[in-house]
Amino acid sequence: NMHSLGNIGIGGKLHANLAYTSTKIIDNIRYNGRNIRKEIYQPYLDNNKSILDMCCGVGLSTPPGQIGIDTSQEMLNVAKKYTKIANKNTKFYLENAEKFRPSKKIDIVTCMFAFHEMPNYAHIRIIQNALMIAKEEFVIVDIAPNYKNKNPPEIMLKGEPYLINYLNTINDILYDFEET
């Protein structure tokens, strides 16, 4: 499991380089060739919305010409390498999604496939921060909570230590932030 390598140092460098290719392969299989991330952000781009992608990792969920932030320099290095080819206007910053404050509000804030990799307190802090940054919407995309019925294999859990807790608690956490 590449997640067992961590996100920093030599293990993080290896993880980041594997993540870009393996994520594309896995997504191609899981979503039948659809680019699910692009399907989510494209309508916002079509309407000229500014987008901040929190916990962007290797940049696969960061729209062209927009901003991605992550706490792993190794992940950002890979993101910059691949987006330099596709879109030079995409910006990546080494920042913590719990604390990052841009100089101005951003129309749409996204966080894709990251919540299952962090503890509950981080979910809450990121949601609170994203709601302060976003002018219009905060979009979270991650593993569906009913995935727990499939009994994730031990090898997955070794690299994803927060997965079971995420699956068991994310609905309650999100409910606390539901619009009234």
Model-derived features with residue positions:
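A short, conserved alpha-helix within the catalytic core of class I
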Residues: 118-129
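C-terminal alpha-helical "lid/dimerization" subdomain adjacent to the S-adenosyl-L-methionine
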Residues: 139-180
